[in-house]
Amino acid sequence: MIEYDRIFSWLENVEGAMTCRGYIPCFKASGGTANYYGTQSVTDYRAMGVSGVTIGVGVDLGQQKERNLRKWGVPEEVLDKIRPYIGLQSGAALRALRNNPLTLSLDETQALTRAEHYGYLSSVVIPWWNKGE
């Protein structure tokens, strides 16, 4: 039996607490790291790897496909709000967030996070794990 709540708790420890404000984990040109929220100039920020806009508990929209999010049960009104960021990574994600900072309600953020986590675990992680048995 999969202990989803235990996995989600672990993810929150790794990814950080749930956040309703979209951000991109970045390196700063002036040194160090910081999350970019779209409210300041992008010139001092460089996305870590292929990071995209992240929200909830580690839901990186740059790594997502709309069809998967829909299949996993993300509500249509949430998809409408996150659509501009889906699939965008690095510089493209920074520009999109700069032009339109993202904030979801707590209910929307929780719905997105749970649907993405359950969907990813059920369709990717568990089948991969089962192949190893």
Regions found by a protein language model. Give the residues of each.
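Acidic, aromatic-lined catalytic clefts of primarily extracellular/periplasmic carbohydrate-active enzymes
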Residues: M1-E133
